[in-house]
UniProtKB/Swiss-Prot annotation:
Keywords: Amino-acid transport, Membrane, Signal, Transmembrane, Transmembrane helix, Transport, Vacuole. It is found in: Vacuole membrane. Its main location: membrane. Involved in vacuolar transport and vacuole pH homeostasis. Also required for cytokinesis. The chain crosses the membrane at residues 48-68, 74-94, 100-120, 137-157, 159-179, 242-262, 281-301, 306-326, 332-352, 368-388. GO terms for biological process: L-arginine transmembrane transport; lysine transport; regulation of intracellular pH. The keyword Repeat does not apply. This is Protein BTN1. InterPro entries: Battenin_disease_Cln3, Battenin_disease_Cln3_subgr, MFS_trans_sf. Belongs to the battenin family.
Length: 414
């Protein structure tokens, strides 16, 4: 098979699957947030459970992840994500604490997976590995939100059944890693020679001397200080603008959008049978925008002014807050859906262009480490947004209730 298909396409497809599977459960969980905790509970509850474990492991990863082989990490991803989805889907609606535990397990898998696969791109041509992974993460958002919307909004399937179906998807990691992925190329794809995948694993294996020589005993304090010094130069050019974009977009997605509601009798019943359905459709339009923009590198589109994207995304926060409070400037859900799509475009552009900039501008010797570290910033942004949304959503909802619109309290029913 590999003799008939160009290796570049196989690399792209492998990393596309990695990105797709790594992010799709995260997207589905957020799409189901209103079903998991109900209308009265801030959706930030699910967002924080879905992001704190991921953020924690991303922060800790630079200090220990190099000691765990890529093969071991793949099996960890499968176990954590599949079991987590089983817990979420099979526990009763009243067992919110148990569902939160399942969400946390899936979140750990997502965080470890992003660090792992971004580091793995270092061993392949970035035009195909980064582009494939980025497109896959965008595809996860689009596929996950669309399938969830299709099965629940349109076909009327029980939410727990839909979540149970998604529990089998992580097995695809094994196929992509062991069957599809070609042998690793040394030095980020810029050198002609290849190294076997076993050799790649040796450099991340605690029993190997490739990562730490027995003659080079480094104290824990020295290792931490050295790691922090390597992280600091990445903050201003890459991590901060990406973080700011994610703060803004997740304030919109989980804090503001549950209050951006319209009369159900003015909406098509085949798509919107309850106020809860509006939230799900917003999620799909956002993910559609993310998918389009995260795939933009494949078409040669590059945006290097990363802070511009941060400013534009914050403007969307201002617009949507105004809409929630005053029901202006949008009088139709369709115009608001277009804005949500644009919001997704900005988020996707920021993600893919940030990692492309790291790949192009950071020295080869530090590139693998840097790719893993910069991934912390988007998760930190989502974490900040979750903390803000904890009070923002209830406040916006109370303002609407005070003027006679209690739709935000009825997300699960018409």
């Amino acid at each position: 098979m590999q003799l008939l298909i160009p290796e570049s396409r196989i690399v792209f497809a492998s990393f596309f699957i990695f990105g797709l599977l790594n992010n799709i459960l995260y997207v589905v969980i957020l799409s189901a947030a209103i079903d998991l905790v109900g209308s009265a509970t801030p959706k930030a509850t699910v967002l924080l459970a879905d992001i704190i474990p991921s953020f924690t492991i991303k922060v800790m990863a630079p200090f220990f992840v190099g000691l765990i082989s890529y093969r071991t990490r793949i099996w960890m991803l499968v176990g954590l994500s599949s079991f987590g989805m089983l817990v979420i889907s099979l526990t009763s609606d009243e067992s919110i604490n148990a569902k939160i535990v399942g969400i946390c397990m899936a979140s750990l898998s997502s965080g470890l997976g992003e660090v792992t696969f971004l580091q793995l791109t270092h061993f392949y041509q970035r035009e195909y590995s980064i582009s494939g992974f980025s497109s896959g993460t965008g595809g996860a958002g689009l596929l996950g939100s669309f399938v969830f919307m299709l099965l629940t909004n349109m076909l009327g399937m029980k939410v727990w059944v839909v979540l149970l179906l998604f529990a089998v998807l992580p097995l695809g990691f094994l196929m992509a890693f062991y069957v599809m992925l070609p042998k690793a190329r040394g030095g980020g794809g810029d050198e002609p020679g290849y190294e076997a995948l076993d050799s790649l694993d040796e450099r991340s294996d605690p029993s190997s001397n490739a990562s730490f020589s027995s003659s080079q005993t480094v104290s824990l304090k020295g290792h931490v200080v050295s790691t922090i010094k390597n992280i600091l130069p990445l903050i201003r050019p890459y991590m901060l603008p990406l973080c700011l974009v994610y703060v803004s977009e997740y304030i919109i997605n989980q804090g503001i959008s549950p209050t951006l509601l319209f009369p159900l009798d003015e909406l098509p019943h085949w798509l919107f049978s309850s106020y809860r359905d509006i939230y799900v459709v917003y999620g799909f339009m956002y993910q559609l925008g993310v998918f389009v923009s995260r795939s933009s590198i494949s078409f040669g589109i590059r945006i290097k002014r990363l802070y511009l994207l941060s400013v534009l995304q914050f403007a969307n926060v201002v617009i949507t807050v105004y809409q929630s409070v005053h029901d202006k400037p949008f009088s139709s859900v369709w115009l608001l859906l277009a804005l949500i799509f644009y919001e997704g475009l900005l988020g996707g552009f920021s993600y893919v262009n940030t990692f492309m900039s790291v790949s192009e501008e950071v020295s080869k010797s530090k590139r693998e480490f840097s790719m893993g570290c910069v991934g912390i910033s988007d998760t930190f942004g989502i974490l900040l947004a979750g903390c803000i949304n904890w009070s923002l959503e209830p406040h916006l909802c109370s303002l609407q209730v005070n003027r006679g619109r209690d739709w935000c309290l009825n997300g699960g029913s018409a």
